[in-house]
Design a protein with these regions (language model features):
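Active-site helical microenvironments for divalent-metal-assisted chemistry
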Residues: 1-192
């Protein structure tokens, strides 16, 4: 937060990085959630996706100061809460590795196959949309791209929505200018 007035205006208390749930605890929550609806499902793909995402994002931090891996884990937990398949959850864990790390789409395809890499690539392409502009033609183009992605595989949109949901849940760490563009209820601290 830029100043104390902004903090009071939003009526929130910022957490110290030490207060965040550890990645290990979140990972165990993810596995437990998956086991509830797929008790016999082979989760080696999800375990591998977590290891690769954790390594790829190892040096990165979020604006809050927490390890970056917490974001993909929370996205994956949202997807697991929706009882998505293991390919979708793996793609949720990996959704930022091509965009934000040195990992390439080809490497991702080699490690996880074409289905997971297709989902990650689709989310990456949706990320390139202009979400914050008000111009009608940009909005129409964004909708066109989203409808095309939905026609190919609705899971791309579901992963992107889980990504946006987690980003909104951590909106208290956005710059004040960005916070002003969103309704107050979006950026209040809440469930991860």
């Amino acid at each position: 937060m830029a100043n104390e007035g902004t903090k009071e205006k939003l009526d929130i208390e910022l957490e110290a990085p030490a207060d965040f749930t550890s990645p290990e605890v979140l990972y165990q929550d993810l596995i437990n959630t998956i086991r509830k609806y797929h008790p016999s499902d082979d989760i080696t793909m999800i375990e591998k996706a977590y290891r690769i995402a954790d390594e790829a994002h190892k040096e990165q931090k979020r604006k809050s100061g927490e390890p970056y891996i917490i974001h993909p884990l929370c996205v994956a937990i949202i997807l697991a809460d929706l009882e998505m398949d293991k390919e979708t959850i793996a793609a949720g864990l990996l959704h930022d590795v091509v965009e934000d790390t040195i990992m390439t789409l080809e490497q991702l395809t080699k490690e996880f196959g074409s289905e997971v890499s297709f989902l990650v690539d689709g989310v990456t392409k949706l990320t390139q949309l202009n979400w914050d502009k008000d111009k009608v033609e940009i909005q129409a183009d964004n909708l066109r791209k989203m409808f095309l992605a939905m026609a190919k595989d609705i899971r791309v949109i579901i992963i992107k929505l889980a990504d946006r949901l987690h980003n909104m849940r951590t909106g208290q760490y956005w710059k004040p200018e960005k916070q002003k563009k969103c309704p107050k209820w979006i950026i209040l601290p809440g469930k991860r």
